[in-house]
Amino acid sequence: ILDSFTLLTAELTAELTAELTARKKQYSYYRDTLIQKECKSEKVKLNTVCEIYDGTHQTPKYTNGGIPFVSVENIDDLYGTQKFISTEAYAKYKIKPRIGDVFMTRITAGIIGKCTVVERNDDLAYYVSLALLRPNADILDSKYLKYYLESVWGRRELSKWILWDATPTKINKDDIGRVLISVPPLDTQKRLVQVIEHFDVICTDLNIGLPGEIEARQKQYEYYRDLLLTFAETGSTLMT
């Protein structure tokens, strides 16, 4: 019985995991298809429509509280960082993040070009492994920039400048500015962002539900496994 239940749980978990992977691929395909339609627009160097900075090149002295400090490991959750620096250290930052800025991973063993749009005006210190992109709001929408750089088309452009032999891999700040990006009219960018975000919400809801289902199935398996083992050891009657 236990072997059969183990096999059933493993098969179900594999199916749910495959579904989660499929949803992520579906989102990426949909985003890339929408971006591709805009690749016919005029391409410009990123540094002509965007200011580009990077963070401190020195590992800071961390404090128990103060100003949140982020690096590539925080790209998915900027405000969840557990590292802080003093207000005195932060005062030395010449460029402080503000709403509409875009953080992009630029030095990492992971993915170069992963982005997050800054949505708060809270103080936030950042490391050299992150580039801070400040789009010209009259020309370039922040979220469009994020989606473009994360698309297959943006990654192709970034890959031309990535130093693949470096450890970890990186793209120099000045080379980020040489990346070509398609810039359709601003209203077109905003419409595209609206469509991608709508689809993103759908995929995110599914992605939240599927891992929860996998965890629930695992807990269910562990419960019945322990119950069966207890029954086998004691000869007790199984209770429901």
Regions found by a protein language model. Name each.
Residues 33-56, 209, 213-219, 224:
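Non-catalytic DNA-recognition/assembly elements of restriction-modification systems
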Residues 124-131, 164-185:
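A short glycine-rich beta-alpha junction/loop motif
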Residues 1-24, 28, 145, 177-218, ...:
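Amphipathic alpha-helical segments
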Residues 47-59, 73-101:
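Sequence-specific dsDNA recognition surfaces
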Residues 71, 93-152:
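A short beta-sheet element
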